[in-house]
Amino acid sequence: MPRSAPSLLLLCLLCLVACAGADGEAPSSPEDGDRPDPPAASNPRPAAFAFACGELALVAMPEDDLVQIRMPDRALTLPQVPAASGAKYQRGEVSFWSKGEEATLVLDGREYACRLVPDPFAEARGRGIVFRALGQEPGWVLDLEPATGLHLVYDYGEQEATVPFTVPVVGPGRTRIESGNGRDEVAVVIEPRFCADAMSGAPFPATVTVTVNGRTLQGCGARLVPGAPPGL
């Protein structure tokens, strides 16, 4: 990797590597709560939470009285049910019970103990980024922020492009954003299906394809805040 890669990209990759090893030293047990607290009071609450459940990885996305769960081989939508503590979601014999940084998943007759993966995007969320995607070989990071546009850093930081944010086009099973600035043309396709980072294995709720000036980049992404534009 070139030595000139920007600190943003390096920080992103280091955070994801940390996520992959989240089952090492156990964090202190938090008080029970409906959802994990944000890293700082000034930051909005995350829209998606990654959990490591032994050999399983999943992403949970709470929405009012239900949760969407994405895993490598399936996607689930579970309604919320009464619980003595935390937030419990259940449909039939399948349930997901979240208590702060820990959760219990019951699936296919098995019970899994889950632990929250540390949030690598707290700083970006605090800056107003609504969606972030990244990929490897070559390393790239894409930030979407309606007020400032789409900012893509790629080729390990050697290249970058910033184009205006345009209204996403939401279609069956995918969202597409196309924009340009007279020099760079960028198209982003977001598919709401489980994705694992190629370097760290960290789980994400979306698979992302970026095309910049005819060149295609593959990776994963996540909506960082609730209330983002439809399709993100």
Q: Model-flagged regions — what are they?
A:
Residues G21-L232:
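Cysteine-centric segments in proteins
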Residues L16-A18:
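C-terminal motif of bacterial Sec signal peptides marking the signal peptidase cleavage site
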Residues M1-L9:
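Bacterial N-terminal signal peptides that target proteins for export
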Residues L11-L14:
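Hydrophobic-composition signal
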